[in-house]
Design a protein with these regions (language model features):
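A short, internal acetyl-CoA/4′-phosphopantetheine-binding micro-motif in the GNAT/acyltransferase core
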Residues: 64-71, 99-101
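Conserved acetyl-CoA-binding loop-helix of GNAT-fold acetyltransferases
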Residues: 66, 72-85, 108-113
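Conserved GNAT acetyl-CoA-binding A-motif
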Residues: 87-100
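Conserved beta-strand-loop-alpha-helix junction that forms the acyl-donor binding cleft
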Residues: 97-107, 123-129, 137
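Conserved acetyl-CoA-binding loop of GNAT-fold acetyltransferases
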Residues: 111-121
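Short phosphate-binding/catalytic loops that engage adenosine nucleotides
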Residues: 75, 92, 116
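Acetyl-CoA-dependent GNAT
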Residues: 2-68, 80-81, 86, 122, ...
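Terminal substrate-recognition subdomain of acyl/acetyltransferases
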Residues: 124-151
Length: 151
């Protein structure tokens, strides 16, 4: 099991150096929550929890990242459990996320195994160039939205 904490100001530089915090500006501007997974006092994964999601209006898990060496070891499960607990603690009923319909089958299988189901909305095609950490990144993907009731 991995310890999961909310990102603290004193940890930003250390975490960002190892695990790029792609939504750090959004986190600072909107009061969203960055969750950090730790193993032996080292950051090994993160997830961004936007309290008002971009598509469904529900709290939305975004920007999940786990160090490649620790994928399929329970880090993402620990991050998901922590996000769900925060949503429950605020008295909210559901949490959502989007995942690639075609190019990220392992993540989709993970979320479905955790109880996320298709939200019943039309998949969204994302195409173009985005900037992550100052670098251009070409995107051409179709996202499906999943939802989980946490109460």
């Amino acid at each position: 099991m991995f310890a999961v904490t909310e990102l603290r100001p004193e940890d930003v530089a250390r975490v960002d150096a190892l695990l790029p915090l792609n939504r750090l500006a959004q986190h600072r501007e909107t009061g969203s929550t960055y969750l950090i997974a730790w193993k032996d006092d080292e950051p090994v994964g993160h997830a961004h929890l936007a309290w008002t999601g971009t598509h469904l209006g529900l709290p939305e898990v975004q920007d999940v990242y786990v160090l490649p060496a620790l994928r399929r070891h329970g880090v993402a499960r620990s991050l998901s459990a922590a996000a769900e607990e925060l949503v429950r603690a605020r008295g909210l009923l559901s949490i959502s996320l989007s995942v690639s319909r075609d190019s990220n089958a392992p993540a989709r299988l993970l979320y479905e195994s955790l109880g996320y189901v298709d939200a019943g909305v039309e998949p969204v095609r994302v195409r173009g160039t985005i900037t992550l950490r100052g670098q251009p990144f070409d995107v051409d993907d179709t996202l499906v939205y999943l939802v989980k009731h946490v109460r």
